[in-house]
Curated annotation (Swiss-Prot):
Quaternary organization: The glycine cleavage system is composed of four proteins: P (GLDC), T (GCST), L (DLD) and H (GCSH). Interacts with GLDC.
Gene name linked to the record: Gcsh
Modified residues (N6-lipoyllysine): 104
Extent of the transit peptide: 1-45
Assigned keywords, A-Z: Lipoyl, Mitochondrion, Transit peptide
Cofactor annotation remark: Binds 1 lipoyl cofactor covalently.
Protein name (record): Glycine cleavage system H protein, mitochondrial
Pfam families associated with the record: GCV_H
Chief place of localization: mitochondrion
Length: 170
């Protein structure tokens, strides 16, 4: 019995020595790539802001990415056409910037913030159904610079938006 305990202790001691030799005495600092991947993971929803007209926006380094909410895409049904602005278009908060058409309805799109369009999701021209398949990732609509980033404070958090949707469904 004592022989088994002795062997077990030697194995544990060896494991600890091996583990400690691989530990760096410097503090662990995540790389920029690791931080970027964390930001684009599940935490992304916590920084997404919503409008009462069901658009969402996320920002990174002064550029906003705009799309429609899951609630909106479900209400629309299968999106068959997207009308989006040209790059360089200047938008004011709540200004109409395009439209989505589905088999059962059409819906105007409104800018959640003031700014200038820097990119349009060209993939939607050939595959507008991306809005339905991936409204928060591949189905984004436009990217824009922000004229007044403080306007973000006036938008709803994900939690507030969920409460808002529940209130209008009742």
């Amino acid at each position: 019995m004592s022989l088994q305990v002795s062997r077990s202790l030697r194995v544990v001691a060896y494991s600890l020595r091996t583990a400690l030799t691989f530990c760096s005495p410097r503090p662990c600092v995540p790389s920029a790539a690791a931080v970027r991947s964390l930001r684009t993971g599940s935490a992304l929803l916590s920084v997404r802001k919503f409008t009462e007209k069901h658009e969402w926006i996320t920002t990174e380094e002064g550029i906003g990415t705009v799309g429609i909410s899951n609630f909106a895409q479900e209400a629309l049904g299968d999106v068959v056409y997207c009308s989006l602005p040209e790059v360089g278009t200047k938008l004011k908060k709540q200004e109409e910037f395009g439209a989505l058409e589905s088999v059962k309805a059409a819906s105007e799109l409104y800018s959640p913030l003031s700014g200038e369009v820097t990119e349009v999701n060209e993939a939607l021209a050939e595959n507008p159904g991306l809005v339905n398949k991936s409204c928060y990732e591949d189905g984004w609509l436009i990217k824009m610079t922000l004229s007044d980033p403080s306007e973000m404070d006036e938008l709803m958090s994900e939690e507030a938006y969920e409460k808002y949707v529940k209130s209008i469904e009742e």
